Each structure stands twice: as C-alpha cells, then as structure tokens.
Amino acid sequence: MSTESMIRDVELAEEALPKKTGGPQGSRRCLFLSLFSFLIVAGATTLFCLLHFGVIGPQREEFPRDLSLISPLAQAVRSSSRTPSDKPVAHVVANPQAEGQLQWLNRRANALLANGVELRDNQLVVPSEGLYLIYSQVLFKGQGCPSTHVLLTHTISRIAVSYQTKVNLLSAIKSPCQRETPEGAEAKPWYEPIYLGGVFQLEKGDRLSAEINRPDYLDFAESGQVYFGIIAL
C-alpha cells in the first residue's frame, strides 16, 4: 500500500467519526450550568437558614384568631349601649320606715320603673307579653334563738290576667336557729339572706308580688339588701 492511499484511509476514517460538540462554546455552556446549579443550591440553603432561625417567616399574631368574631360582638355591645332600650324593666327597694310590713318603693336611689312597668298596690304590673327575668332578695337578722322554731319564708307570686288566682312562682324557706339559746348564754346575732330568681312567660296586665312571713326580722341596716325587680328579655 502506498503512502498516499494510507493518508486517504486515515482522512476517510476521521470523516466517519462523529464530531464532538466541545470546543470553547461547549465549555462555556457547562460552566454556565454549573454556576446556575450552585446559585440555586446556595439560595435554597440560605432561605432554609433564615426560616429556621426565625429571621423571616409569618409574623406572630398579636390578636386572637377569632378577632373577626369578637369585633362584631363588641360593636353590637357598644351600639346597644348607645341605643336606649325600650324593654320594660323595674327595680324597687324596701321602705325601711314601714314597720311590720314589706313595702316596695320606686322613688329611691337605685330604684326605677321604665317602659310601662307600674308599681300598684305593692305589686309590679307587667306592661306587655313576653319573657321576663323575675328576681328578689331579702335579708333577715335576729338576736339569739327563741324557744319557738323560727321559719323564714320568701315568695314571689303571680296573679295572671287569664286566671285571677295568686300562684307562687318562686319560694324558699329557711330556719336560722337549730337550737334554742340557753338561758344565761350570750345571744349572738344571726343573718339569713334569701334570693329568688327565674325566667317566666308573662302576659300583659299580670301582677307580681314579693312577700315574706316575718317582716319584723328584716334587716335595713344597709341599702340594697332588700329589693324586687323584673327585666324583659
């Protein structure tokens, strides 16, 4: 084989081999991809560190999560406090000068009759039908215990328009003395409060009374101890 034919075979073999895509342009592309991958990894690592150490992230809540529920409720309370109520309400107190009886008064400090409620014949007259909270408190006071058993009762009664009969709505009985004070022993004072309260459906014109069986034991030493009232709901 001549030298020329050998050179020609080598050239043909080189042409048959696939050409590489390297060179300066391929090197730059690989360098760019490597740099881009490094930046992505570095950025992800930095973000993880910032989140882990609390440098960035969701801000802490300074208010309750249910603030959206509290705000309307607070606004409703504020608006209702600014708006005068037209619901019937009454709060009467005992007359400390009435001896031997429980007499209710509305022309005293911290007493009121509003929106149609009347105090007539020592009874509260309901101005409209509806649900009412009825309440009353009395305070009894004594000195020592007599030989006879002491029973103290407190009752709230209703005389309805539909049936003219007194019916007890709430009632309580208490006995402050368990045994008689021995003769010659010191007669110690005792106190016995009774509170009554409940919700009832009332009709227009119903009459309500709060009564006791032993007015001689009532304690009027402080104001606000004996009272009677209704609140429309």
UniProtKB/Swiss-Prot annotation:
Occurrences of domain THD (ranges): 88-233
Gene3D superfamilies found in the cross-reference section: 2.60.120.40
UniProt topological domain (Extracellular) ranges: 57-233
GO biological process: antiviral innate immune response; astrocyte activation; calcium-mediated signaling; cell surface receptor signaling pathway via JAK-STAT; cellular response to amino acid stimulus; cellular response to amyloid-beta; cellular response to ionizing radiation; cellular response to lipopolysaccharide
Cytoplasmic side: 1-35
Molecular function via GO: cytokine activity; death receptor agonist activity; identical protein binding; protease binding; receptor ligand activity; transcription cis-regulatory region binding; tumor necrosis factor receptor binding
Residues recorded with modification Phosphoserine: S2
Post-translational modification: The soluble form derives from the membrane form by proteolytic processing. The membrane-bound form is further proteolytically processed by SPPL2A or SPPL2B through regulated intramembrane proteolysis producing TNF intracellular domains (ICD1 and ICD2) released in the cytosol and TNF C-domain 1 and C-domain 2 secreted into the extracellular space.
List of glycosylated residues: S80
Lipidation (N6-myristoyl lysine): K19, K20
Annotated site residue numbers, Cleavage: L35, F36, L39, I40, C49, L50, L51, H52, A76, V77
Disulfide bond positions: C145-C177
Keyword Disulfide bond attributed: yes
Membrane topology: Single-pass type II membrane protein
Impact after mutating R108W: Biologically inactive
InterPro entries in UniProt: TNF, TNF_alpha, TNF_CS, TNF_dom, Tumour_necrosis_fac-like_dom
Keywords: Cell membrane, Cytokine, Disulfide bond, Glycoprotein, Lipoprotein, Membrane, Myristate, Phosphoprotein, Secreted, Signal-anchor, Transmembrane, Transmembrane helix
Places the protein is found: Cell membrane
GO cellular component: cell surface; external side of plasma membrane; extracellular region; extracellular space; membrane raft; neuronal cell body; phagocytic cup; plasma membrane
Consequence of changing E222K: Biologically inactive
Residue spans crossing the bilayer: 36-56
Subunit structure: Homotrimer. Interacts with SPPL2B.
Disorder association: Psoriatic arthritis: An inflammatory, seronegative arthritis associated with psoriasis. It is a heterogeneous disorder ranging from a mild, non-destructive disease to a severe, progressive, erosive arthropathy.
Family recorded in the similarity comment: Belongs to the tumor necrosis factor family.
Name of the protein this chain belongs to: Tumor necrosis factor
